[in-house]
UniProtKB/Swiss-Prot annotation:
Entry domain remark: The presence of a 'disulfide through disulfide knot' structurally defines this protein as a knottin.
Name under which the protein is recorded: U15-barytoxin-Tl1b
GO CC terms: extracellular region
Tissues expressing this chain: Expressed by the venom gland.
Source organism of the structure: Trittame loki (Brush-footed trapdoor spider)
Superkingdom: Eukaryota
Compartments reported by the entry: Secreted
Family, similarity comment: Belongs to the neurotoxin 03 (Tx2) family. 03 subfamily.
Cystine residue pairs: 54-72, 65-78, 69-119, 71-90
Major localisation: secreted
Record's signal peptide: 1-16
Role summary: Ion channel inhibitor.
Length: 121
């Protein structure tokens, strides 16, 4: 009788506990969902939207330009084509890599700051 009670209690205990594999699977799914949900928020904090407050005479995105200081925006650059005979256009250099995009934004901002000094002269 005691053996029967021990077996029943063991069986009930084993059934009541979820398996370790099921817990790990659920935990991995939740962790993946959390990471997917957090990625856009991280990107939004790291690279806020570029809000351009333009001075009269500055060119909007897509307009033809010759120098970076002509374009409206902190990181807007005059993107030139491979041949120098064609004029460039105002825009933002982009890359699909988040880190690379941050580096481009930083480099373009510094470049625009320096070119603004030379354009003013």
């Amino acid at each position: 009788m005691k053996l029967f009670m021990v077996l029943v209690a063991s069986f009930a205990f084993a059934v009541a506990l979820p398996s370790k594999k099921r817990e790990e699977t659920a935990e991995n799914e939740l962790t993946g969902d959390l990471q997917e949900a957090a990625q856009p928020m991280i990107y939004a904090v790291a690279f806020p939207e570029i809000r351009a407050s333009c001075v009269i005479g500055w060119k909007q995105q897509g307009a033809k330009c010759e120098r970076d200081c002509e374009c409206c925006g902190v990181a807007a650059t005059c993107i030139t084509r491979s041949t120098n005979s064609l004029p460039g256009f105002c825009g933002y250099r982009q890359t699909p890599n988040v880190l690379g995009q941050g580096l481009l934004y930083t480099a373009d901002t510094i470049s625009n700051g320096l070119s603004a000094i030379f354009c003013a002269a």
